[in-house]
Amino acid sequence: MSPQTETKASVGFKAGVKDYKLTYYTPDYDPKDTDILAAFRVTPQPGVPAEEAGAAVAAESSTGTWTTVWTDGLTSLDRYKGRCYKIEPVAGEETQFIAYVAYPLDLFEEGSVTNMFTSIVGNVFGFKALRALRLEDLRIPVAYVKTFQGPPHGIQVERDKLNKYGRPLLGCTIKPKLGLSAKNYGRAVYECLRGGLDFTKDDENVNSQPFMRWRDRFLFCAEALYKAQAETGEIKGHYLNATAGTCEDMMKRAVFARELGVPIVMHDYITGGFTANTTLAHYCRDNGLLLHIHRAMHAVIDRQKNHGMHFRVLAKALRMSGGDHIHSGTVVGKLEGERDITLGFVDLLRDDFIEKDRSRGIYFTQDWVSLPGVLPVASGGIHVWHMPALTEIFGDDSVLQFGGGTLGHPWGNAPGAVANRVALEACVQARNEGRDLAREGNEIIREAAKWSPELAAACEVWKEIKFEFEAVDILDVV
């Protein structure tokens, strides 16, 4: 990088530019239990040594700047600086390496994902000395976790609210995502819930557009779910999207949902922002609302392997900020999601203590110290033939969400919901009897279809539908 060009200054310090590694590369440093630890995938510009690039990441995401400043003498740099304490090669990649950086906890505001990300994934990602930079994982120390409320309710409380146990929950996104009137939208909600689904969902695009204003949608959807509850004897929900252009409008929608007595609202947490999300999560806990989270815009940030931020980091951030559900990919559907990587961040969402496991992309052991868990939502291009794989991959503590796989049924919405509920119950029963869902899945579905004409029709429609493309973001070859 820049050569050392120090000159004497009359104020008693050496002005100029010096290599970052002199201050911020500390291979002998032993990280503290209270440090936030980060694993960065670094691709430096040609000629930039790994140690200098790693130190630059630590500096520019903590206390450093491009030149020596006299106010450095007014603080304790050793107390507040980030430290690159380890450099690790990436198998099969000569131009990349993993830089491990430790950040003192005092650098971050308590209970603020916004502040944490502003430092760790801020201006450093535009640093010219780096060709690319990706945040692969974070270790959030117990001391910082305890400053967050986390999910409004968590997995067990949600099951108790819904009185549903021993199986994944079933959902459906109402389609077409845009253009329906509020009354027709409510009709679709009613038909899906009556047919056996636990939830229906606003699409992430649905806020308050001219064809369907939010208040009208909320009213018709509430009417639909209460009618379906009365007919089925089951508790039902519809994810009413409270996302809005301002936090004030978002909260107005959440308050109206609470007044209607519905069980759950929804937020687009990346486009809406972490400050808005945490605000809404606190309201939901205080007022008994579940909170469904959509991750719209995540792939802009996390899909490319050498630059951006891995979704496991966004998942950890969401658990801290607050949400009871979050979309997590399907492994088998139309959206990006390699199996081992997906299972890794599903563990980070649901479990209380997760060991380091590089085979699943987990760089650090994470202790959530009883912060409530988040239900992963599998959604996007899935249908009844995927049910055995989804049940086997995600287990009971998940939401399986079939949009086109419900509303695309040749007989209508309610039969589409029936087909999915029958397929799910068949898979859960087969699993409980000790059958191998991965090996016998298709046979289990065929057997169930003999007793359900709705399922048989769905099986016929989607028997040839597959999404067989290789994932872009895959684990490094060791």
From Swiss-Prot:
Reaction catalyzed: 2 (2R)-3-phosphoglycerate + 2 H(+) = D-ribulose 1,5-bisphosphate + CO2 + H2O; D-ribulose 1,5-bisphosphate + O2 = 2-phosphoglycolate + (2R)-3-phosphoglycerate + 2 H(+)
InterPro entries from the UniProt entry: RuBisCO, RuBisCo_large_chain_AS, RuBisCO_lsu_C, RuBisCO_lsu_C_sf, RuBisCO_lsu_fd_N, RuBisCO_lsu_N_sf, RuBisCO_lsuI
Miscellaneous comment: The basic functional RuBisCO is composed of a large chain homodimer in a 'head-to-tail' conformation. In form I RuBisCO this homodimer is arranged in a barrel-like tetramer with the small subunits forming a tetrameric 'cap' on each end of the 'barrel'.
Keyword Disulfide bond part of the UniProt annotation: yes
Its job: RuBisCO catalyzes two reactions: the carboxylation of D-ribulose 1,5-bisphosphate, the primary event in carbon dioxide fixation, as well as the oxidative fragmentation of the pentose substrate in the photorespiration process. Both reactions occur simultaneously and in competition at the same active site.
Gene for this chain: rbcL
Post-translational changes noted in the entry: The disulfide bond which can form in the large chain dimeric partners within the hexadecamer appears to be associated with oxidative stress and protein turnover.
Complex and partners: Heterohexadecamer of 8 large chains and 8 small chains; disulfide-linked. The disulfide link is formed within the large subunit homodimers.
GO MF entries: magnesium ion binding; monooxygenase activity; ribulose-bisphosphate carboxylase activity
Keyword check for Chloroplast: yes
EC number in record: 4.1.1.39
Binding site for Mg(2+): 201, 203-204
Modified sites of kind N6-carboxylysine: 201
Lineage: Eukaryota, Viridiplantae, Streptophyta, Embryophyta, Tracheophyta
Annotated site residue numbers, Transition state stabilizer: 334
GO biological process, one term: reductive pentose-phosphate cycle
Cofactor remark: Binds 1 Mg(2+) ion per subunit.
Residues bearing the modification N6,N6,N6-trimethyllysine: 14
Similarity comment: family membership: Belongs to the RuBisCO large chain family. Type I subfamily.
Domain of life: Eukaryota
Residue stretches spanning the membrane: none
Pfam families: RuBisCO_large, RuBisCO_large_N
Name assigned to this protein: Ribulose bisphosphate carboxylase large chain
